């Protein structure tokens, strides 16, 4: 099994790249996010690989970080109806920490933004991975803490709305969720959307 490729970027396609390792070109299928970070042809590149072996083919999936590869495995191994194509679509739309945030906040709509992922599949992703997401949270510690504060239910509308509002102002969902987590601790669980946004912005201004 191939676990990592380190070589020179030889080609970038719509959903894959070719890495030249010692004169041998390896085709690795990647998320759009991974492809966008590879740089130009001819530059050194390292990919963490997930190898699929079937009777009629061997397919390599490449990831820029070990965390992204772990989420690729997690999605397929734990969520019914999610294969490699859907997993790559999710990871093309959301970073690992954004995905962990969405699961922590039970933000089904954010997960459903990925092409080919309807609400039912997004709901399964959120439900099936809610207990596993903390171990793969990456930078999403604020949202994980927020989820623990809220308990097992769906995040109240003011919380989800506040995160979305801060994200619409240009902050990443990671940063927005962390700010709302701090705001919620300060204001209490009964806080409305406006209060959470105001306190969240105050937190971001520090």
UniProtKB/Swiss-Prot annotation:
GO function term, MF aspect, one: four-way junction DNA binding
Location of this chain's protein in the cell: Cytoplasm
Region annotated Domain III, chain positions: 154-206
This protein's UniProt keywords: Cytoplasm, DNA damage, DNA recombination, DNA repair, DNA-binding
Superkingdom in the source lineage: Bacteria
Function description: The RuvA-RuvB-RuvC complex processes Holliday junction (HJ) DNA during genetic recombination and DNA repair, while the RuvA-RuvB complex plays an important role in the rescue of blocked DNA replication forks via replication fork reversal (RFR). RuvA specifically binds to HJ cruciform DNA, conferring on it an open structure. The RuvB hexamer acts as an ATP-dependent pump, pulling dsDNA into and through the RuvAB complex. HJ branch migration allows RuvC to scan DNA until it finds its consensus sequence, where it cleaves and resolves the cruciform DNA.
Protein name: Holliday junction branch migration complex subunit RuvA
Organism: Chelativorans sp. (strain BNC1)
Gene it is expressed from: ruvA
